[in-house]
Amino acid sequence: FSPIDRYNDNHTQETYEDREWENVYRSTHGVNCTGSCSWKDGIVTWEGQELNYPTTGPDMPDFEPRGASYSWYLYSANRGVLWSMWQEELQNNESPLDAWKSSWQEVNELIAASNVYTVKTYGPDRVAGFSPIPAMSMVSYASGARTPDAHFFTEVRVVSVSPDFAESTKLCDLWLAPKQGTDAAMALAMGHVMLREFHLDNPSDYFLNYCRQYTDFPFLVTLSKQKGDQFVADRAADLVDALGQENNPEWKPVLWNENTNDFATPHGTMGSRGKWNLEQRLEDEETGEKLSVLGIEDEIGTVRLQLADGSTALVTTVYDLTMANYGLERGLGGQEPKDFNDDVPFTPAWQEKITGVPRELIIQIAREFADNADKTHGRAVLNLVLLVGAQGVNGGGWAHYVGQEKLRPAEGWQTIAMAKHMNSTSYFYNHSSQWRYETVTAQELLSPMADKYQHHGDYNVLAARMGWLPSAPQLGTNPLRQAGMSPVDYTVKFAAEQPENGKNHPRNLFVWRSNLLGSSGKGHEYMLKYLLGTENGIQGKQGGVKPEEVEWKLSSTCLYSDIVLPTATWYEKDDMNTSDMHPFIHPLSAAVDPAWESKSDWDIFTSLSKKFSEVCVGHLGKETDVVTLPIQHDSAAELAQPLDVKDWKGECEPIPGKTMPQIHVVERDYPATYERFTSIGPLMEKGIAWNTQSEMDLLRAWAALSEFTGRDHTHLALNKEDEKFRDIQAQPRTVITSPAFTGSEKQSFYLDHDMMKDFGESLLVYRPPIDTRKSRPEVEGKEITLNYLTPHNKGGPIVWISETDARDLGIEDNDWIEVFNSNGALTARVPAGMTMMYHAQERGGIHNSVTRPTHMIGGYAQLAYGFNYYGTVGSNRDEFVVVRNINWLDGEGNDQVQESVK
């Protein structure tokens, strides 16, 4: 390379020196960032960006990743520190065993013996493994810089929405700073403005046509009267029996056909099992999908019709419901706002009191956002994007940074991956006993018209029993010991019902590609106390037991592990990477051999499976196991529970795959574990039309999918059948796009599941931050309670508070302070010469997150569990904490080392 590197758009970057290399390998940082590295004499010499990505279209800049560097991990002194310590200890003890370092062979045998004992004594599902984000290195799973976005920052108007002046804010045109946890109110007010001005006052044809074709706005919803004159929106598909539908009538929502002035059900909804509906057709004719019943109504905003049983019902459209939900004045009377200055829910004036953002700014940004989308046809939060037709349009759409990254080539990848998959959020919530510390009951979050379970833990159990979510351990007994018994005899007792029974506790836990205790587990101190039984910093009261006071120290998963195995980094193994952030499949290439004694994850588990197969002989042979599987998304089973939520414990019969999980009897040949681990089995021959004598025939599969959906999809996979791993090493390839199916087969504004209605979330609503009230411990001295926002910009062990709060507390810049609540505590300071520590590495319980019962819904069209798709998540959330000054640490020689007890 010359001293000046030239990149896309003809800009350059000085490199200051010539570089020499022997080979160039394409790899990545391993998370979202993409790039390449080169090596010389077996050493990675430098890292730089690659530019030969496929084009993203003529109206978008070419992809230009400026990814993060990883070589500092590769050659970190930490990788050799244990080796150095062992060598030093070896000089004193002479014996390598006394020097506490083991060999791969010994460790494999120890782990294998432990697994055999656990499987034999407690059951196979008491052995667990945890690894996050399969898409970031999918082969390793099966065995942070966001600077790329800066390339698209030019020539666009960027608005930052952040309670604090974040790093990204300084690059934006406008900064909206809502109070923590109130951004939903701001977004709803923007939606109010858009609907008022671009749907009602001056309707945009583009917006209305988009909503008609690509959203569930035209579908009809029944209204039932409850508690006096109050009406409650009910299921969207309760009318279909009157239309003579026979096949899955409960899954075929109804709309008003303007062409015939009658009710109709389009093909392509979930009841049609995959038929495409975006062409707005009935079986044999075009539909004119009416957005609103205004103008044809029998009563205010509704139409009354007669059902097949002779009764009558009031119906309206999802569009009309949404208008009412946003508080739009449409001449129907009632307490509707006259303009944006009325203090009525969801108006700009209403949100101003909640968020602190001036109403004028909300009106301005909403108008500019919608006007731009109207003029450019979508090149512009999720509701806002749909209202202006900006989803699925190049240059528009909704992008997010947190969440689950999509593993794109799942069909082929699953043939070598997966044991019994578990949703980790519920798993760690149950086994770390976080349900013990809930201060807000489910009843307090429910709609006043709902009467369901009282506790968050109850929803986890309900979801496991009904087959909504996977559960591990599955059953309250070891299925290997129940040979000869019918699975029905012992599968009605789920382990989730008694998570603290010693027999239902996880025994062996493998963790790879993750700092589970520091970040991924969500609930650090609870995991230390209940999952591991070690020292912890929980300060909340539980059952009257006062938590212990502990010495604060840095925590990580390795520090609490019995065995630590050295693994290869992203530059030392071959793998693949996909992301929501870009449409490419990117390789990770082995530029150098694994350093020290490390091995790739795949090689580690291969050697473990080989030793396990040897050790289990005489203890485990061919055994009969029972596996429960949740009702899966994108399968016929997702139509299993169309109506009420009924628990088979007292409300209906237990029917596997219908009212409870699917139950499968599986033969485990434990001595053949290694042979099976290193082979591709017969499952690749199954599917809708796969031909895998040598490899999967992609075009054949897509031809079958085209016949299934009624649309030609083969062009999406053309020229893909010959692509190999070496091809993406030369240049990343674009992924194959495919349709996703929902209940209405459109993007949904309205969700009619019973649990969504119970929690009042069938339509978008604003929920203020939850006040946990008495959850904090008692303190003495001057204090202030703040609404603490979990930092998202990856800061270190420092805390920012306002100047006003600091003055009230007597805190100055660079002081030691203590931040604590019932989940734990942390201390923070920024002394001179201190380096920054990235988030998720420090101990202190800052990653204690809640989940939502509505994420547990299953067996209901798109609301059905699927791997890497849908399930409970540990959400980023607001938290109330106490901050107090601890300046007694200064002047006592504690600037660098904090005493454990004061």
Curated annotation (Swiss-Prot):
Record comment: activity regulation: Inhibited by micromolar concentrations of azide.
Matches recorded under InterPro entries: Asp_de-COase-like_dom_sf (IPR009010), MoPterin_dinucl-bd_dom (IPR006657), Mopterin_OxRdtase (IPR006656), Mopterin_OxRdtase_prok_CS (IPR006655), Prok_molybdopt-oxidoreductase (IPR050123)
Cofactor note: Binds 1 [4Fe-4S] cluster per subunit. Binds 1 molybdenum-bis(molybdopterin guanine dinucleotide) (Mo-bis-MGD) cofactor per subunit.
This protein's UniProt keywords: 4Fe-4S, Cell membrane, Cytoplasm, Electron transport, Iron, Iron-sulfur, Membrane, Metal-binding, Molybdenum, Nitrate assimilation, Oxidoreductase, Transport
GO molecular function, one term: metal ion binding
Hydrolase in keyword set: no
Listed SUPFAM superfamilies: ADC-like (SSF50692), Formate dehydrogenase/DMSO reductase, domains 1-3 (SSF53706)
EC number(s) from the headed UniProt entry: 1.7.5.1
Location relative to the cell: Cell membrane; Cytoplasm
A Pfam family the protein falls into: Molydop_binding
Any one annotated GO CC term: plasma membrane
Cofactor(s) the record lists: [4Fe-4S] cluster; Mo-bis(molybdopterin guanine dinucleotide)
Catalyzed reaction equations: nitrate + a quinol = a quinone + nitrite + H2O
Binding, [4Fe-4S] cluster: H29, C33, C37
Principal subcellular localisation of the protein: membrane
GO biological process: cellular respiration; nitrate assimilation
Induction / repression: Induced by anaerobiosis, there is no significant expression in an aerobic environment. Expression is further induced in the presence of nitrate or nitrite.
Family the UniProt entry places it in: Belongs to the prokaryotic molybdopterin-containing oxidoreductase family.
Subunit structure as annotated in this protein's UniProt entry: Heterotrimer composed of an alpha, a beta and a gamma chain. Alpha and beta are catalytic chains; gamma chains are involved in binding the enzyme complex to the cytoplasmic membrane.
Protein role: The nitrate reductase enzyme complex allows Bradyrhizobium sp. USDA 3045 to use nitrate as an electron acceptor during anaerobic growth. The alpha chain is the actual site of nitrate reduction.
Name of the protein this chain belongs to: Respiratory nitrate reductase alpha chain
Gene name per UniProt: narG
